[in-house]
């Protein structure tokens, strides 16, 4: 069982949040975590993973073009992504910087791929996914770990019911 954590990060802020998501995945026995920036991710990485957690900084209220180009470029494997788990995380420079719309743009792409999407757990806010503004990294680090763990636990549960 594998969870892919992929992201775009120009300054390192989103990468740092991706690493926290990875920490959460690693807490679940039997689930491997593959973490890659979106410019290094391959179609095989998508196909070989049971779940995809994607992250982006906010760019004009949406995901970065670099991450969107992955979804656009992988359109040919959409049918093979049906039923896989999807989740999202986002970062912004400012507190009211469009994080929720960015999360929704990522989740929307996952829905178009036929994926089953999930938000962050209730003990991490219970919204569309994990998001924070610059300077809030320490506050939301634990929420990213919780998201990664929640995704990995669902991978295990779904694997047990399909086997």
Question: Which residue ranges define each predicted feature?
Answer:
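A generic structural motif
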Residues: 28-33, 115
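Glycine-rich phosphate/pyrophosphate-binding loop and the adjoining helix
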Residues: 41-42, 116-163
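A generic "alpha-helical surface" signal
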Residues: 12, 61, 101, 138, ...
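N-terminal beta1-alpha1 ligand-phosphate binding loop
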Residues: 1-28
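Short hydrophobic segments within beta-strands
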Residues: 6-8, 36, 89
């Amino acid at each position: 069982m594998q969870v892919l954590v992929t992201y775009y990060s120009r300054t390192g802020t989103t990468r740092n949040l991706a690493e926290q998501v990875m920490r959460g995945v690693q807490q679940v026995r039997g689930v491997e975590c593959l973490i890659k920036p979106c410019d290094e991710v391959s179609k095989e990485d998508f196909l070989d993973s049971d779940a995809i957690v994607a992250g982006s900084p906010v760019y004009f209220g949406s995901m970065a073009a670099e991450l969107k180009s992955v979804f656009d470029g992988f359109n040919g494997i959409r049918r093979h992504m049906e039923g896989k788990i999807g989740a999202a995380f986002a970062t912004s420079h400012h507190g009211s910087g469009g994080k929720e719309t960015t999360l929704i743009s990522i989740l929307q792409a996952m829905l178009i791929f036929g994926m089953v999407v999930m938000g962050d757990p209730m003990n991490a806010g219970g919204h569309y996914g994990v998001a924070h503004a610059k300077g809030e990294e320490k506050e939301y680090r634990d929420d990213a770990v919780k998201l990664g763990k929640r995704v990995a636990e669902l991978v295990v549960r779904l694997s047990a019911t399909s086997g």
